[in-house]
Amino acid sequence: MFESKINPLWQSFILAVQEEVKPALGCTEPISLALAAAAAAAELDGTVERIDAWVSPNLMKNGMGVTVPGTGMVGLPIAAALGALGGDAKAGLEVLKDASAKAVADAKAMLASGHVAVMLQEPCNDILFSRAKVYSGDSWACVTIVGDHTNIVRIETNKGVVFTQADNAQEEEKNSPLGVLSHTSLEEILAFVNAVPFDAIRFILDAARLNGALSQEGLRGSWGLHIGSTLAKQCDRGLLAKDLSTAILIRTSAASDARMGGATLPAMSNSGSGNQGITATVPVMVVAEHVGADDERLARALMLSHLSAIYIHHQLPRLSALCAATTAAMGAAAGMAWLIDGRYDTIAMAISSMIGDVSGMICDGASNSCAMKVSTSASAAWKAVLMALDDTAVTGNEGIVAHNVEQSIANLCSLACRSMQQTDKQIIEIMASKAH
């Protein structure tokens, strides 16, 4: 059995990917609130009649302008209502996957009657916070999610507290597979990818299946800003070359188009984000097809991409002013570089050039325009790989890029953790002013 060949560090890598790379239907911030509402509704015997919800500013930012799958509507109120009336609390990020047409109609009716209120949680010390309190007659139930999109920390009803997360949860995090990433390096990740038995990582091919299907859907329909299908038309008009670079751009943006436009297909997410999962997957798939990679090579490249993206994102807040499609694309750069020449130096140079290129891109909330940023990040990743293949990269003499890739990553993440906090507040203020 392959288990005997896997050391504890490698096992932690595999578990980290299994924990962070999951199917998700719909943008994960409104889905987090939908999950809270579904979990609260599951505690009641009767039908939910009213919902009060509270979210953190960052969750509000990412939930204001994005379409909830199957509804044709944007925003947190419809997500909360559909979660309460048609959600499956056991399905995690796919909480809305089995929502019926009747549940959608009932959710819209609940909104029209003014029985759904979504408010900012103030004060709020948590980047990711969602709380849903649902009412049925004289009964109520309240569920709170903190820190991660599916991390339920408290369940309470009018009869008392049903569940509360253990106080030692933070200590357990340090020893978790994700906690191990704080003490590893890209070199160790590459060594793992090169040597781990294929059967142990075969599961990552599901990312190619799910995100590939989203890409195809994006090219077929007019989802979101339909960037992918629009650029494909420009190829037919002779305004864009039909080459590998364009294929990466079109197929990656098409998947994000479908994702953000409300397609009822799941994305394989990364670090709690469907767009990050798309960005870490589709460019690698396109290059793998170009070089004729078999399933094993594709799986290793995808594992390198996703694990590198998780490794970088683990040094960031769960939500921030930094567009994390950029960090996911750094993972994609690693995966694409590995497919072509496999050298650590090429991978490190590509990531460093990415940090010198797109590190200033802001996150101004989840919306159709995320597909623009996904396509920009994917294109930048391929450009960085092409440079690295010729031993060219942004060097430690320039900007925030350091003389080694690990310090470059640390420099980038320090911006999001500290100096970009004020940027985040300003973005939220601007978006809130537009809502009035």
UniProtKB/Swiss-Prot annotation:
Which GO molecular function annotation, any one, does this entry have? Answer: L-cysteine desulfhydrase activity
* GO BP: any one term: L-cysteine catabolic process to pyruvate
Any one Pfam family here would be SDH_alpha
UniProt xrefs under HAMAP family: UPF0597
Which family would the database say this protein is a member of? Belongs to the UPF0597 family.
Under which name does UniProt file this protein? Answer: UPF0597 protein YhaM
| Lineage of the organism | Bacteria, Pseudomonadati, Pseudomonadota, Gammaproteobacteria, Enterobacterales
